[in-house]
Amino acid sequence: MADFVKLSIFGTVFEVTTRYVDLQPVGMGAFGLVCSAKDQLSGTSVAIKKIMKPFSTPVLSKRTYRELKLLKHLRHENIISLSDIFISPLEDIYFVTELLGTDLHRLLTSRPLEKQFIQYFLYQILRGLKYVHSAGVVHRDLKPSNILVNENCDLKICDFGLARIQDPQMTGYVSTRYYRAPEIMLTWQKYDVAVDIWSTGCIFAEMLEGKPLFPGKDHVNQFSIITELLGTPPDDVIQTIASENTLRFVQSLPKREKVPFSTKFPNADPVSLDLLEKMLVFDPRTRISAAEGLAHEYLAPYHDPTDEPVAAEVFDWSFNDADLPVDTWKVMMYSEILDFHNLGDISQNEAEGPVTGEVPAAPAS
């Protein structure tokens, strides 16, 4: 049985094994507090995320189980990797991952990004998404604060708590509003990996401009702002709207023409705008894919088709429709944690090569 140390951080009790020292708060999310720490076993800095009361409801239990399963399954250079997981005596769950130092949101609020860094960050986002999407997973909540970056400009996508199966009948209210794809707002269903490409397009535009592209005050305003740039949605897109109320709202909006991206982004490289326009398309069926985005001329300095891998296996979503009591989720969680530790030391696993792909060198400052 591991020894635990109890600390109070931001008024929140943190119970961690004695392996981790020098805890410092770095962020607070909707579902947990994140601290940096020193891992005495590996000598590296790590991030420890406390999942608050994971067994308080079946919904929270399932959400935590889903995130754990995904972190175990997704092994790629541009996806945050799990190095340890434990349940404390108070039955809180702690995920331990690598620490990257900052995120894209903080970078964007501190200074404008130069072209080569925008290219490199966008390349890594799409490289990670190509892998994630090939595993049958949709992130659903991509935004600058979920994209971690270190001092070498290595980028990793994190926070898979809302991720879901790629399913044409997906439902739900997800993603921070500014980055939310129109099909989520219009139909509440029938969306797939293309929602992540829309979010990436919004992030790309924000890197180019230094400010959010579609800063909606609410759901209605958000959609209205999108139409100010992209124009009125095509009829075939409007016909896919499932909700009568939403359909009436869209039909009530004034007819708008698309604004040329060169007008909206007068200082941007035309090649970058060509890629951006292919991402910010109303119809998800014609939106560019992650793999197609990687092959675009704008990312030519980094594109390497031999080193942009896909997942070896599609993620097993069989648990996702299960409506189980907390105690059952708890047993399943313990089983997954035991399995994780039985795989042996994570660094040994990495030495043997389970993490897919090597990221190219960062641009020179």
From Swiss-Prot:
Q: Where is this motif: TXY?
A: 171-173
Show the catalytic activity: L-seryl-[protein] + ATP = O-phospho-L-seryl-[protein] + ADP + H(+); L-threonyl-[protein] + ATP = O-phospho-L-threonyl-[protein] + ADP + H(+)
Please tell me where ATP binds in this chain. V26, G27, M28, G29, A30, F31, G32, L33, V34, K49
Gene Ontology process terms (BP): stress-activated MAPK cascade
Q: Which residues carry this modification: Phosphotyrosine?
A: Y173
Q: Where in the cell is it found?
A: Cytoplasm; Nucleus
| Top-tier EC class | transferase
- SMART domains registered for this protein in UniProt: S_TKc
| Required co-factors | Mg(2+)
Please tell me one Gene Ontology term that the record gives under cellular component: nucleus
* Role according to the record: Proline-directed serine/threonine-protein kinase involved in a signal transduction pathway that is activated by changes in the osmolarity of the extracellular environment. Controls osmotic regulation of transcription of target genes. Also involved in the response to UV radiation, heat stress and oxidative stress. Mediates the sensitivity to fludioxonil, an agricultural fungicide.
Its recorded name reads Mitogen-activated protein kinase HOG1
Species for this entry: Cryptococcus neoformans var. grubii serotype A (strain H99 / ATCC 208821 / CBS 10515 / FGSC 9487)
Please spell out the taxonomic lineage of the organism that makes this protein.
Answer: Eukaryota, Fungi, Dikarya, Basidiomycota, Agaricomycotina
Q: Its encoding gene is what?
A: HOG1
